Amino acid sequence: MKLQQKLAILADAAKYDASCASSGSTNKSSKNGKGVGSTSSGMGICHSYTPDGRCISLLKVLFTNFCIYECSYCINRASSPVERARFTVEEVVNLTIDFYKRNYIEGLFLSSGIIQSSDYTMEQLVSVARELRKTHDFRGYIHLKTIPDASPELLRMAGLYADRLSINVELPSKQSLALYAPEKNPATIKKSMIVLRDHIDESKESRKKSKKIISSSSGSVQKNKQSSKFIYSPAGQSTQMIIGADQSSDAKILTLSNNLYSKYNMRRVYYSAFSPIPHSAEQLPAQSPPLIREHRLYQADWLLRFYGFDVNEITASSTAVNDSGPAGMLDLDVDPKLAWALRNRHFFPVNINTATREILLRVPGIGAIGANKIIKSRRFKQLRVMDVAKCGLSIKKIEPFIEAVDANPACRLLEDENLKQYFIKKESAQMTLF
C-alpha cells in the first residue's frame, strides 16, 4: 500500500479522538500549478493548544487501525469491516519531518490500535518519539496516546520524549466499560494514570530544585545541573471520555472529571459525543446525543477548574428552572453558570463595587478577565452600570444580576418567573444574525 493511502486511512481513523480539533477548513489543491499554501496533501492536520496558549497545527494520525480489542463503540474494533493500514516507525518519522519542513505542522499527535500486545504497541509509539527527538533533533510538540496495559518502564520512556501523554478513561462508569469494552480494566487505567502522575510530579520537583541550584551556583556548575534535570511530559497528562453511549448523567460525568483533576492532576478532560457506527452493539444508542450537551459539559468543566464551582452546584436539579429531562443533567437551553444563577436568585444582585473576585466570577457574563478589569477600574472610582460595558463585557447579560452606584432597573428582572425565557429569546435573536 502506498504511503499516501495509509495516510488517508489512518488520518481519517484518528478523527474520533477529541484531544485536538480539526481545522475545519476546506482543502484547496495546487495540482494545476496555480496558487500557493495548499495543504491538500497534508491530510491529518489538526489544531491544538499548547500549555502557554498557542494554537498549533499537528499531524494527527494512528500508527495503525488494526486492533485486537472488541470495543463496541469503536470504529476500529477487531470485527469492524473497515479498511486497515499500518505505518512503520520510519514512515511516521519521515512524514512528521517532511510536513514540519514544509511548515504544515508544528508537532505530532500519535495514537494507535492495539496490535500483538500492549507492550509491543507502546514500543512502536515510543520508538517514533525517540527517533524524532534523538536522530532528527525534532523540537516540535509531541502528544502520545499511551496504552494503559503497557509496562511502567515503557510509560516512563514515553514521557521522556513526549510533551504530553494521555490515557483514555473511555466511559463514565465501570459497568459501561465492562459492557462495551470488556478487555479494558478501569483499575489498570487508573493505575497507569498514577504512574504518569508520579513521574510528572517528580519532574516538577526536579525542575524546581534545578532552578534553585542554578540561581545560587556559578556558570560551570549551572551547566552540569541543567543537564541533570529530569524532564517528563512537561505539558502533563490528559484523558478523553465518551458521552451519550450509556445512561450516565452529566452529574456522574462531571464528578468523575473532578476526581480525575484532583487525584490524577489531569491537565484536561476531553468530552467526545458518541457517534453511531455501522454494525455496532444493539445496546448502543442509534443516534448521537445533542452536540450542545458536549458543549455544556465543556462549559461546566471550565467552571469546575477556574471559577470555584462545585459539581453539586452545577448539576443540582430545580423544577422551577429546568423542568424537562432527568435529574443530574445540565440545562441545554442556557449555559451552566446562567442556569446556576437562575436557581440561586437570592445570591443576586451583586454589588460590583464591593464584591470579591470569587463572587464576581459567579455573575453570568463575567469571566476571569472581566472580573480583573472591574476590580482594577473600581480602584479609581465608584462604578456605574455602564462602566461594566467599558470593561469590554456584554451589559445585557450581566445587568439583571448586578447593582452599582447608580440605579439599575434591570435588577427587577430577578423577580420575573420567565427570566430564563428572556435569555433564551435574546440568544435566539442573536443567532439569526449569522
Language model: regions and residue ranges:
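Flexible, acidic/Gly-rich N-terminal and inter-domain linker regions that tether
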Residues: M1-F66, E403, A410-K425, M431-F434
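Conserved, mostly hydrophobic/aromatic
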Residues: L58, C71, L110, I167, ...
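Short, charged beta->alpha transition segments
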Residues: K60-V61, E90-K101
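Canonical Radical SAM [4Fe-4S] cluster-binding loop centered on the CxxxCxxC motif
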Residues: V61-E90
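Conserved AdoMet/S-adenosylmethionine-binding subsite of the radical SAM
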Residues: V93, Q116-Y307, I314
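Short Fe-S-cluster ligation motifs
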Residues: I97-S111, A300
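C-terminal extensions
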Residues: G325-L361, V385-F434
